């Protein structure tokens, strides 16, 4: 913990409560000066008594807008060893997520990659919604097998995600794009578009991204709202 953000402190308290309920030893290490966070993480990575690390963000915040991310917080995420990263935010896990790789040890496939929990929970909620995912794709997901890019969601699924944080918006966009949705990733300064997992130039406005509706179709809307992200999924069904 290297900030005074009330939401981060509350999240840390909830994390501790959940860990204690499951019999997991939980310790908060407070860093007074953010400049010492990297050293503290390196020490935790090397500590044999530490099996998992959670960093409570924001620490430095975003420097400038870039889809790849350019903030010091991004650097801090990559300082956490993948062997201790329980949030799936380090470079290795992010890279595997964007390439739709589910295991750390292919082709043996014994060690599963860790996915960001909030983004994954949204996907699981959508799997439970009718007429969104192919049933065989859900079965493959439950077995931790990655379906081919673009073949999990049913045709003509459009998703608009208002938020592009490294914790929620960005990984969620990648997951749903890999599953076959046309995804519009909206942040304060830009809009990105994914088609079948491929990043493309977006010419639509925010309003057009949210209102991707054709008059000849009946739309089902699923709204999943958090304080830091809004996902709007539209599923086109013939009238």
Language-model features: locations:
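Short, well-structured alpha-helical segments in soluble
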Residues: 36-48
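Generic secondary-structure signature for well-ordered alpha-helical cores
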Residues: 20, 24, 46-49, 78-85, ...
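Short beta-strand elements in bilobed, periplasmic/extracellular small-molecule ligand-binding domains
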Residues: 16-32, 183-186
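Glycine-rich loop at the start of a catalytic domain that most often binds anionic cofactors/ligands
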Residues: 11-16, 41-44, 67, 74-76
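Glycine-rich phosphate/diphosphate-binding loop of Rossmann-like nucleotide-binding domains
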Residues: 2-14, 103-238
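Short, ordered loop/turn segments at secondary-structure junctions
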Residues: 1-4, 31-33, 57-62, 81, ...
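Periplasmic-binding protein-like
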Residues: 49-59
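Glycine/small-residue-rich loop that forms an oxyanion/phosphate-binding "nest" at active or ligand-binding sites
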Residues: 62-108, 112-116
């Amino acid at each position: 913990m290297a900030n005074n953000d009330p939401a981060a402190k509350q999240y840390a308290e909830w994390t501790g409560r959940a860990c204690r309920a499951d019999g997991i030893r939980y310790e908060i290490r407070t860093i007074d000066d953010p400049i010492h966070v990297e050293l503290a993480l390196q020490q935790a990575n090397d500590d044999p008594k530490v099996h998992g690390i959670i960093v409570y963000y924001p620490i430095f915040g975003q420097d400038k807008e870039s889809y790849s991310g350019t903030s010091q917080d991004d650097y801090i995420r990559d300082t956490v060893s993948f062997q201790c990263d329980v949030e799936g935010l380090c470079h290795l896990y992010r890279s595997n997520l964007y390439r739709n790789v589910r295991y750390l040890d292919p082709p043996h496939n014994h060690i599963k990659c860790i996915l960001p929990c909030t983004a994954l929970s949204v996907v699981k909620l959508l799997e439970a919604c009718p007429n969104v995912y192919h049933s065989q794709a859900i079965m493959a997901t439950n077995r931790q097998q990655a379906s081919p890019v673009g073949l999990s969601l049913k045709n003509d699924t459009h998703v608009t995600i208002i938020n592009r944080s490294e914790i929620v918006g960005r990984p969620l966009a990648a997951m749903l794009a890999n599953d076959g949705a046309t995804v519009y990733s909206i942040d304060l300064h830009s809009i990105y578009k994914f088609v079948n997992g491929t990043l493309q130039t977006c010419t639509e406005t925010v309003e057009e991204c949210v209102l991707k509706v054709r008059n000849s179709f009946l739309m089902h809307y699923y709204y999943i709202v958090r304080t830091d992200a809004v996902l709007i999924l539209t599923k086109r069904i013939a009238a």
